[in-house]
């Protein structure tokens, strides 16, 4: 991991910090600086976002690691993650748009992992409230209205212990050509019965409470009908995860996450097109199929009606493949937007091979501005030999269709715990005066 000059300049004039915050700044601050540098952010925007990261994100990451085992295993980053409370995303640019950088965190506080806060809500809500007071574009009206509908009504002590865990995450998007920081909140119902009631009870009532009794629920109702009556849509399963934009109510989107265990490309295409109701050109479907097969390590000649080959773990057990999607619900739209997620953490393809496949796709189709800058980021976070031989940096690639091209985002992990010993060697070799 090589330092970026602007990170050094910002660090030089920061006030003293405690040991935990110093650690997280040295690791994740450098990651953020490298991403913005490679993405071509203006220097003033880099400084602004680094200061936001230092003072509004770093204090929420909790104690620094003391070993390669997390004291609290965060759900950020999904199955690929090592328990670290932060991960990143890189939304590849288009011909007229630079890449966009985001991070996702599960805020950790004094009550995290204690009986006083079994769902780890306190630190997250405090952070969101702070954002609403310091970021002019952040509006929590929708979040505060939705959140009580997702909170479980748990009385029995055994149930509380059984269902304890993360219930909220926060995402921050830092666009290169904007002076705002866009905030998203993600809610996770902990009680299984809540998930089954999401489309029929919880979301309709939450949307009426937020937008008024006469809110148009066409988009939400379509998702419910698609998942109950359509032959392909009925194979989808709700995860319960719901994302919400923390902005003015009229601009807020609600994202509903689902999974399927049908891995045939015909099924994937049917979900992306909402059973043909949202057409996608044959050319784009062909691009998506080629990318899907390559990232999943499937032979190019595999018929589109066939399931992906079952993957086997090193211990000989089977590794089930699931495909996540989300539906983007907005009251003013009759149909939801759809995004697919390609999990590469369980793929037989190495992280480096997967990243190269995406960059190659973008270059072949004239998408993105300097997509190889993304490779520079990955190689800076993790040595090339580890990207070639180990898994864990890459979590997902998401794919949506925007303006007649594939809009691709990479989600990846800093591996703070997995690479704990390497980080210790690196940090102990740095000049302490730069950071303290």
Curated annotation (Swiss-Prot):
Entry's Gene Ontology molecular function annotations: prenyltransferase activity
Superkingdom assignment: Eukaryota
Functional pathway: Secondary metabolite biosynthesis
UniProt-listed Enzyme Commission number(s): 2.5.1.-
Top enzyme category: transferase
UniProt keywords, alphabetically: Transferase
GO terms for biological process, alphabetical: alkaloid metabolic process
InterPro entries registered for this protein in UniProt: Aro_prenylTrfase, Aro_prenylTrfase_DMATS
The family this protein is said to belong to: Belongs to the tryptophan dimethylallyltransferase family.
PANTHER family: INDOLE PRENYLTRANSFERASE TDIB-RELATED, PRENYLTRANSFERASE ASQH1-RELATED
Biological function: Prenyltransferase; part of the gene cluster that mediates the biosynthesis of neosartoricin B, a prenylated anthracenone that probably exhibits T-cell antiproliferative activity, suggestive of a physiological role as an immunosuppressive agent. The non-reducing polyketide synthase nscA probably synthesizes and cyclizes the decaketide backbone. The hydrolase nscB then mediates the product release through hydrolysis followed by spontaneous decarboxylation. The prenyltransferase nscD catalyzes the addition of the dimethylallyl group to the aromatic C5.
Stated name of the protein: Prenyltransferase nscD
Organism from which the protein derives: Trichophyton tonsurans (strain CBS 112818)
């Amino acid at each position: 991991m090589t330092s970026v000059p602007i990170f050094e300049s910002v660090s030089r004039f920061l006030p003293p910090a405690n040991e935990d915050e110093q650690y997280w700044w040295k690791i994740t601050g450098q990651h953020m600086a490298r991403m913005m540098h490679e993405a071509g952010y203006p220097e003033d925007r880099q400084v602004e976002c680094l200061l936001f990261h230092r003072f509004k994100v770093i204090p929420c990451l909790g104690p620094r690691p003391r070993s390669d085992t997390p004291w609290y295993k965060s759900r950020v980053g999904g199955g690929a993650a090592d328990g670290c409370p932060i991960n990143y995303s890189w939304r590849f640019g288009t011909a007229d748009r630079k890449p966009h950088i985001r991070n996702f965190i599960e805020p950790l506080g004094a009550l995290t992992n204690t009986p006083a806060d079994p769902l780890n809500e306190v630190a997250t809500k405090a952070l969101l409230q702070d954002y609403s007071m310091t970021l002019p574009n952040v509006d929590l009206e929708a979040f505060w209205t939705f959140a009580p509908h997702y909170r479980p009504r748990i009385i029995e002590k055994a149930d509380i212990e059984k269902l304890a865990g993360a219930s909220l995450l926060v995402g921050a998007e830092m666009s290169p050509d904007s002076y705002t920081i866009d905030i998203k909140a993600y809610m996770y119902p902990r009680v299984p019965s809540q998930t089954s009631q999401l489309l029929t009870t919880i979301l309709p009532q939450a949307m009426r409470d937020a937008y008024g009794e006469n809110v148009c629920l066409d988009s939400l109702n379509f998702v419910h009908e698609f998942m109950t009556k359509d032959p392909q849509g009925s194979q989808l399963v709700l995860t319960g995860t719901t994302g919400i934009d923390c902005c003015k109510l009229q601009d807020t989107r609600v994202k509903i996450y689902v999974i399927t265990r049908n891995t045939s490309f015909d099924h994937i295409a049917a979900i992306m097109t909402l059973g043909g109701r949202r057409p996608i050109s044959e050319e784009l479907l062909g691009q998506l199929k080629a990318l899907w097969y390559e990232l999943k390590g499937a032979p190019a000649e595999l018929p589109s009606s066939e399931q992906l080959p079952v993957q086997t773990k090193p211990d000989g057990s089977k590794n089930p493949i699931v495909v996540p999607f989300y539906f983007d619900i907005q009251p003013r739209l009759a149909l939801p937007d759809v995004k697919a997620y390609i999990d590469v953490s369980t793929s037989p393809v190495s992280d480096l091979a997967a990243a190269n496949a995406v960059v190659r796709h973008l270059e072949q189709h004239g998408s993105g501005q300097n997509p190889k800058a993304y490779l520079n980021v990955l190689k800076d976070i993790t040595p090339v030999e580890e990207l070639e031989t180990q898994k864990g940096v890459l979590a997902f690639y998401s794919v949506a269709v925007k303006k007649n091209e594939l809009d691709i985002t990479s989600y990846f992990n800093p591996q703070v715990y997995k690479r704990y010993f390497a980080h210790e060697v690196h940090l102990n070799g740095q000049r302490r005066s730069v950071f303290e």
